[in-house]
Amino acid sequence: LVIFIYFRKIIKKENPSRFKEKIYPSHFNIEDKKMNKLIWFHATSIGELKSIVPILKELNSAETKLKFLITTTTLSSSEIAKIELKKIPNACHRFFPLDVNFLVQQFLKKWKPNVIFFVDSEIWPNLIFSAKKFGIPIVLINARITSKTSKRWMWFPGVAKKIFNCFNLCLASNLETKNFLKNLNVENVQFYGNIKLANKINVSAIQNQNKDILVNKRFWFAASTHIGEDEFCLKTHLLLKKKYPDIISIIAPRHIERSKDIKSLSENLNL
């Protein structure tokens, strides 16, 4: 796994100055001794990270003697964290450590969180079992188990039950997830809705930004694209343009760091 992280660094999938955070434990960088409560949120990527920002703001306004550790796994989410966490005092971002027993235990010993919140479908067995062993409360918020994922979990129902029962509380984002956890006889499961829908979106700002581009024009939107799909979308644009000369194609990649690659593909096709 360590070799894999170094390989990802070589192919520019990891931050060259911070990739070791996934291998070595890190210290909190706030020196205020009075701030003795640490809340750890793990949100794997951009969507999960943005969904917890309102929660962080509420917690910070309610209790000023808190410090927050936010961990993510992707390069793109770390860039968003720089922006979002500037608005939240006493918040710190780190990359999530590899889910290897001795690494996660070192991480827990260094940071000593008072509680850990996992967001969405982030299930890391070694960290979960270690936190339980250390007596650290763990909560799964916005829990999301798809029908495909639930079938995989049911290959090992005993293991699934053991893992999910480590959580002190599971807040399901939908009834499908709640029913799945209930069928596993997981305790402390509640349906709380999708917290991603709680974010306030400035619709007017988005409309004003795009109105001149899209007004009176045909357009189509390719959302959450992956490698290999972008070229197909661009070639589709060329085909559509023959019939609809003013067509606008909008591509939103799943991982924002691929934007440069999409731009290069566009230039190669003279777009």
Per-region residue spans from a language model:
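Active-site and donor-binding regions of nucleotide-sugar-utilizing enzymes
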Residues: 6-204, 225-227, 238-244, 254-258
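Charged active-site motifs of nucleotide-sugar-dependent glycosyltransferases
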Residues: 34-39, 213-220, 230-231, 245-248
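Acidic/histidine-rich catalytic neighborhood
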Residues: 207
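Short acidic-capped amphipathic helix/loop micro-motif used as an active-site/signal-coupling element
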Residues: 234-235
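Catalytic donor nucleotide-activated moiety binding site of glycosyltransferases and closely related
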Residues: 250-271
